[in-house]
């Protein structure tokens, strides 16, 4: 089950019923038709449970028993499309939900009444997500939550609605419509709380924390590997210089303290500076070890091949 389906299934388990939720679903998934009896309304979804939810909302608010039909998407074996069909009382529904425009169509923006009321705003966002929302699995890639709109003014109104709850919503035009989206994990979690998906919000947060812990561990591992590589490279340079001294003038020409550090470095090429410092007959500081190694490198540089 995808994370999007998880969120939607949690929302469908809630007993809350609000006309603003139905309004959003119709706005984003509804289409008007004309029959001999007048206007018809068809609300489409690929989720059978959402189709049943729409049916129940219509029955609850308008005592209308809609018809649920389904058909297979062309060239797709699994995806069924469910259509909730209303043939009676469509004008009354549209007027009651403030969806009708003056040209027997659907208003493309969001009613100011929704924007002014917090509970209506939350219900509208819930309906919008049920109808046309998706959220990327937090385990995979970048975080993203989207709601697709046919009309750009609706997408912008949706962004304003999200911003009302302090969410950093943005809008982008795509070939098939306009997308209102959130990209910050914190905004996505807050959105899930706003629409009432508390369990999936908690799951999202747990996955996010696990991802961050993994990333921190990887960064620490990479940093440690880089430090080891740096130590080994510096060690090999010094070892090559010690070998050069041995082949030309011999280590016995060095002072006792330089001889000791040279022999330690040859014996333990993987030792860090601190490990070298601790292994000396008389332990010294890291800066003291670095000073001796620099002297060895300088002596080697001054020798002619």
Swiss-Prot record:
Alphabetical keyword list = Cell cycle, Cell division, DNA-binding
Question: Which ranges of the sequence are annotated as binding DNA?
Answer: 272-305
Q: Which GO terms describe its molecular function?
A: DNA binding
Q: Which Pfam families match?
A: HTH_WhiA, LAGLIDADG_WhiA, WhiA_N
Q: Name one GO biological process term.
A: cell division
Q: Which domain of life is it from?
A: Bacteria
Q: Which SUPFAM superfamilies match?
A: Homing endonucleases (SSF55608)
Instruction: Please give the NCBIfam families that the UniProt record associates with this protein.
Output: DNA_bind_WhiA
- Functional note: Involved in cell division and chromosome segregation.
The family line of this record is: Belongs to the WhiA family.
- Protein name per its UniProtKB record: Probable cell division protein WhiA
Q: Which organism is it from?
A: Streptococcus suis (strain 05ZYH33)
User: Lineage, please?
Assistant: Bacteria, Bacillati, Bacillota, Bacilli, Lactobacillales
Q: Which gene encodes it?
A: whiA
